[in-house]
């Protein structure tokens, strides 16, 4: 009989998670939460993470720092701030193996609300430690990536008006004020949307191209969107009278089934749009110029399938995904 030898198995050492935290030291949210952010970094380090705080100094730094982290094979880039900070960070992470984590401290925090990341920073840090990693799509307009949505029309005009220097300090209240003003007065616009296999003519108040479902923290214009299905969802909000606009907004806020009557809903992988006159664009809540009026050089939207790894709660809404976690 052959003698067998029992050897004690050597425990496999868990690989240390390497991460950087990107924050803007001049933002009010960082000043307010600086002590808590540093406490969270210490908490992650106590759990075996190797974490370094990176402070931005000028526009574009968050993208550069994220890109450098991806090139250095850092496991996680943690964006501290709002959706604007996330928008800048994903420009540097797109197509990489580095995951996006979030400590939400912005005004609306649409991405955090979308996937259920707690808005208190300590709760959000628990998601970093105990959440699940998924790979999702990114939308792209011309050469810029977006995580959430692109809006053309009313919201583009509002976003660009709010970004004027005199209105930046009270951005949230300025947005509400401008929304009320533009909501009643916006004249709508005409354009053509090419979805590859079909072309549609629009007379619209706004057009939303969604990678995700939630818009502005409350409304779901692209309510069928899944952020990992390789498609953009398109919601054309048709031209309405002022009174009907109010009724439409109420239907969307309450998510009534009859909200379908106000819009045309489509999906596509590559979408081209031209308008009769230049129309303002917003991308993830940030202003981005105007639409093209040239059929030869239309405004182009596309999808980067599975372009971004994200850390989200294990309780993230299932209807937002079509694939399993990694």
Task: Label each residue range with its predicted role.
Residues 1-77, 317, 325-326:
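ATP/NTP phosphate-donor binding region
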Residues 2-3, 7, 33, 195, ...:
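ATP/nucleoside-binding phosphotransfer catalytic cores, i.e., glycine-rich phosphate-binding loops
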Residues 45-47, 56, 74, 94-99, ...:
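Catalytic core of DAGKc-family lipid kinases
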Residues 62, 84-89:
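Short glycine/serine/threonine-rich phosphate/pyrophosphate-binding segments
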Residues 79-83:
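N-terminal glycine-rich "phosphate-gripper" loop used for MgATP/nucleotide binding
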Residues 151, 208-221:
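Glycine-rich phosphate/pyrophosphate-binding beta-alpha loops
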Residues 156-158, 201-203, 215-218, 242-245:
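Short acidic/glycine-rich loop or secondary-structure boundary segments that cap or lie
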Residues 166-174, 223-244:
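Gly/Ser/Thr-rich active-site loops/lids in small-molecule metabolic enzymes
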């Amino acid at each position: 009989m052959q003698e067998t030898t029992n050897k004690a198995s050597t425990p496999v050492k868990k690989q240390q998670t390497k991460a950087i935290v990107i924050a803007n030291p001049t933002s009010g949210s960082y000043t307010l939460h600086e002590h808590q952010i540093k406490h969270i970094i210490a908490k992650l380090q106590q759990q075996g993470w190797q974490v370094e705080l990176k402070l931005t100094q000028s526009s574009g730094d968050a993208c550069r720092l994220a890109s450098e982290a991806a090139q250095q094979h850092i496991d996680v880039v943690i964006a501290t701030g709002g959706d604007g900070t996330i928008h800048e960070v994903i420009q540097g992470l797109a197509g990489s193996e580095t995951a996006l984590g979030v400590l939400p401290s912005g005004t609306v925090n649409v991405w955090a609300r979308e996937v259920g990341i707690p808005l208190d920073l300590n709760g959000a840090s628990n998601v970093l430690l105990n959440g699940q990693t998924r790979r999702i799509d990114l939308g792209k307009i011309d050469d810029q990536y977006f995580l959430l949505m692109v809006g053309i029309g009313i919201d583009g005009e509002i976003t660009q008006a709010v970004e004027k220097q005199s209105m930046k300090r009270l951005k949230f209240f300025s947005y509400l004020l401008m929304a009320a003003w533009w909501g009643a007065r916006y004249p709508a616009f005409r354009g053509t949307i090419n979805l590859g296999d079909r072309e549609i003519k629009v007379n619209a108040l706004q057009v939303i191209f969604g990678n995700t479902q939630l818009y502005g923290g409350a409304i779901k214009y692209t309510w069928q969107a899944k952020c990992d299905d390789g498609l953009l969802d398109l919601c054309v909000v048709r031209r309405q009278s002022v009174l009907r606009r109010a009724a439409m907004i109420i239907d969307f806020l309450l998510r009534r089934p009859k909200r379908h009557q106000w819009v045309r809903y489509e999906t596509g992988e590559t979408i081209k749009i031209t308008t009769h006159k230049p129309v303002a664009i917003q991308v993830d809540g940030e202003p981005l110029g105007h639409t093209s009026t040239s059929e030869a050089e239309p405004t182009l939207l596309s999808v980067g399938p599975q372009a971004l790894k994200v850390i989200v709660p294990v309780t993230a809404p299932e209807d937002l995904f079509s694939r399993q976690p990694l």
